[in-house]
Amino acid sequence: MDTDKIIQDLNRRFAAPLPEFYQRRIIFWYDEDKEFQDKLDEVVLENAKVIALTGNNAFSVKKLLSVDDLTTNYLVYSPCVYNRPDDNWLLDVELYSEEFRADLISIWMDEMGLISNPAMRKQVKNYRAYFNAKDRRLKVSTQNKVPETPAQLHMAVMAAICGLKDAQPNMILRSVFQEGLDLNNNTVYQDFVKYHADAAFWAMVRQGCGFVEEEPDLGQLAIHLLLTAATRTMRQEYLAGLDSFISIPHQAYCYDFISEWLHSDNITQLYDVARYVEDKARLYQRFEKLTVEDLVGTECFPCINEVILTKLMTEISDHIIDVDTITNTVEKRRTCVWYEPFENFYDGILQVANMQSFFKEHSAGFHTAEAKSIWKEYTESYYQMDTYYRLFHLSFQKSLETSNILLDDLFKHVVDKVEGLYTHWFLGELGNNWSDVCADELATYGKVLEVPQQEDFYRSRIQTSDTKVFVIISDAMRYEVAATMADQLQRETQSKVSISSMQSIFPSTTKFGMAALLPHKELTVEVWNDILTVLADGQSTASTYRDKVLKKEDSASVALKYNDIIAMKRAERSALVKGMDVVYIYHDTIDEASHTSDTAVFAACDKAISELKNLVRIIVNEFGGTNILITADHGFLYTYSPLKEEDKVDKRGFFDVNVTNSDITKKESIKRCVEYGRRYAIMQKGVQPDYLMPVKFLGGNTEFDGFAPRESIRIKMNGGGMNFVHGGISLQEMVVPVIEYHYLRNDSMEYKRNKQKYDTKPVTVNLLSANRKISNMIFSLNFYQKDAVSTNREAAIYQVYFTDEDGKQISDIQKIIADKTSDNGAERTFRCQFNLKSLKYSNTATYYLVIADEQGLQLPQREPFQIDIAFAVDEFDFFS
């Protein structure tokens, strides 16, 4: 500010009206840097005298102002700096006088609303390069808290450079790391250097983290931070030899910093930083020597997942499957931050544990004497083995999309073990038992007695319905897939859902299964152009004729395709079902996927479930349907591993052995074998192919006989498609699901009477531990899931942490995935370890344990606690 402007401003202020009770005006002009000392003689005011403090005339000036002259206006020029208030003899006069500053630092401080004192002025001068731009000054003045001390000003400048509104050390440090570990290319750090904030940054790091290095190095700092944090959940002896990177006195701060970052929205850079530390400290090689139990509680290093999975998958490959260890480990690790990149591997070995548990329950094999009893066992429990196998291979296929060099081959070895459990033991043992006990009934009747039949579907389910009925037929949706969907429909919709089964017609192929589901008195076959065609009362049942067959029985019927419906506008598809009593909707996702690739089938099962649930919503919300049946034409048999020769039967018995000419052989094969697939053969009567079971074909009212391989054996054929098959008599192929879905309107009597039963709610988690007093910075608590996940109780995820009375978080966050299905309450418990932040805690204050639904749909639970820790420390007072 130039002298003329100073004189103008001072004249204006002295000319202003005096405050009440004031007889004159005294203004102190502070100029600690003595910028205007040489220009003071130029300052001549209209209505005030000018006097200057020299450092030696304080007494005479005070006498002048307080005794000698009580009426004249004075401008007191003060270039003095006092170390203590007592050194300032004019302090009492200053307190009732006005203040004026004309130096740049003072103007900046006034602009930013900073307290003016020597210490603050010193730091503003230190950051002169930063404050030289108005937009940068604005970043400091508009922070959530205006700095009041030099320490706070250091933080504020660093926070402003980082683009932060809160000057928190953790966020400043995180912002630096997010720009990379190379100081030369780290834009935030280079700005610290540019604006002289780098010294403050390293002072903050030294005080908070205990990191001291002669040469600044973010890589070394990262190693120090993560290793020190790890000692909070891992015994320090496991990191022996790395002691120079660990500061136990700063353990709490380092753990808090890493924990907060782990549970923030932006953890991508932390993953890279953690990987860097793992590499430099050779942590993978170190952790390999530890046990799973030693590692399972530490989450900051991604490689811990690789070590744990390597150990567990190696054991599985060596035929050591500890169900409890695998289950408990996955339970613990799935709440960790770095779980997602390894989720497919963990899910896979969890299914191995489920399969092993099933194996232990049935290790004696399957020796049921009656076919209907095996059928009952399969539909009540045995089918779960098919589900475990499907879920395992879903995880395995997904893992192939995101390669992990350490785990990929190991997972493939696990696949071999799974194939042994499922294909050789389960399908072999159960298939052998089933083939033995059903052979006579299939040969004599073509069906299992006392089991509902697919051929009776329309007669027993549709004709007897007194309301409009929608029938969804999903090609190749086997029973276990339908069971999964039924469970989801029950939990996700306001409905009454049940699942039952019926035996598919033989052979369990699309054209026969689809025909069996149509109205008919009799199914017959004819050979048209060398192709076996299925007729319902003389009418073709091919896809283009199904609408006609339905309308013949009931004119208010219609056959639709799922793909057509989905592509239509709402009004268009609603018009198609208007006035109809029976609506058949054909869905083909699973079987269609098998035509592309056998390995795509299990993923298609998941897709089919999603599509069918959506179709149910369309029927309910757009078509007004309340009565829906979901079924299939047949199931399927799938095994991943290549089949061995002993898993196949030759079809030489299908042909006339005396014919050698290839053309004649072809004609003879058509004559002797009307149709065959990998799992069935339809032969001319009298033909007895080797190694196949006879199955009475269409009640014996045709000129053909049916045959099927035992167990999961395939008939040799050219081409692919050996792994995904259907048409045979295995339980996986023949057990056809029937889901009965009844939507319950709010005004329905069933819903009103059983509202508690049908309303789906998330399961809740409560504190089990009785003690409400905390006496250590690290402690554990037990929790329990109140209800088991069931038809009307869905899984939920909870975040659990501690807060003070004002709601400020004072601990790390623990996650509880409440999805336990056991009816045994002791099996629905969780144990969480908490780490309190480095704060000062009062034993008279109330603190709260918060149990919060991750989706925020429920009111958080708050349990009061007392904290009594004798040596708890306060937050770091940085730069003190």
Features from the language model and the residues they span:
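…; additionally, a secondary subgroup of soluble metalloenzymes is captured
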Residues: 1-468, 478-628, 632-880
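Beta1/beta-strand and adjacent pyrophosphate-binding region of the FAD-binding site
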Residues: 472
